[in-house]
Every structure is written in structure tokens, then in C-alpha cells.
Amino acid sequence: MDSQEYIPQYKLILVGDGGVGKTTFVKRHLTGEFEKKYIPTLGVEVHPLKFQTNFGKTQFNVWDTAGQEKFGGLRDGYYIKSDCAIIMFDVSSRITYKNVPNWYRDITRVCETIPMVLVGNKVDVKDRQVKSRQIQFHRKRNLQYYDLSARSNYNFEKPFLWLARRLSNQPNLVFVGEHAKAPEFQIDLNIVREAEKELEQAAAVAIDEEDIEN
């Protein structure tokens, strides 16, 4: 019976400076807002995001900080028993990228070597402060990276898909059907192409140890 179907569930911690778009990102999912649960002792909201795949359903229980990061760091209880993580920064704010190593350090201190994705949100903005060629932290730490625009759904599913493949050990896993709400607007394709071109070029050159993160 369908009610007895086994659905793999993963705890996903979503971290990054306040205002980078973490909650907006989660709420783009069709079920992201309606089924959330609040954990007052940790000050977090847990959003169960379900995805249909060619191997059946899978679910990420996304822990969103609910603004707690503004009060200086997160409690270890937020990180404990996490299966994977997304670190988010805002490409229109250089300081949010400079703080990425701090978030990475906090995760690895508690969780060690869980799969992680670094995402640069708000790539739809015209005044991009963190250029694609400057984003190198993921290369130094062997993380996956994606440009993202939560409001336009650009690359919305890619972080989840990459993590689902890693966690299930199914490299051929794909998502089936729609999982995101209709986009708020259409992203400028010229901006997308230029950023993708820069990322490709950056990946082909040696890592610059003097880039803008520490």
C-alpha cells in the first residue's frame, strides 16, 4: 500500500548570513511553507520538502535558522545528526561570501564530512558584487557549487538533486514532475549565460589563494 511506502528522509541544514534568502528558497517548494514545524528550543523551523524521483519519493527535512544566525552563531543542536548541508550567500553582498568559511567551519566541527552544496543566491540582480570567477571556496574544499535565483526558480532543484544522488548513492537519480511554485519573474537569460561562462572559465584555472574569502 502507498501509505506503507518507505520514503528515505534526510536532515538538511540550511545555513548562511541573515538576509541571503534562505527562507525564500525553502518556500519556493510546493510544500515548503504548509508543513513546517517550529522547534522553539533551538529557534528553527523544519520544512519537509518532498521530491518524486525515478527511484520513488525522497524527503529533505530542511532546518531553517529562522533568523537565529543574527544573534551570533548557532547551537550545536542545530547541526547534530545532519545528513547534508546547503551553505547560502548573496551574490549582491560580498560580506556574506566572506563569511562562508565560518559557516563551513561550524558544520565540519560538528558534522565532519557530510555532503555540502554552496549556493550563490540572487543571481537575478543587475548589480552583482561577487562575480562568478571570484567564487573559489568550493574548489578549495571540494564542495558542489550552484548559482541560484530563488525568486525565478533558476537552479532551484539542483542543490537537492545533487544531494539526493550522493545520499542515495544513485548517480542516475532524477526528479520527476514539478516541485516549485510558479516563479515570481523570469530571469534575464543574458545574465545567466554570462555567469555560466565565467564559472566554466574559473574552473579551468588554478585556484587563487588571494581571492576575497579568507
Curated annotation (Swiss-Prot):
It comes from the Eukaryota. Residues 6-170 form the Small GTPase Ran-type domain. Changing P40A: In strain: IT04. Its main location: nucleus. The keyword Cytoplasm does not apply. Residues 67-83 are annotated as: Switch-II. GO terms for biological process: protein import into nucleus; ribosomal subunit export from nucleus. It is found in: Nucleus. Belongs to the small GTPase superfamily. Ran family. This is GTP-binding nuclear protein Ran.
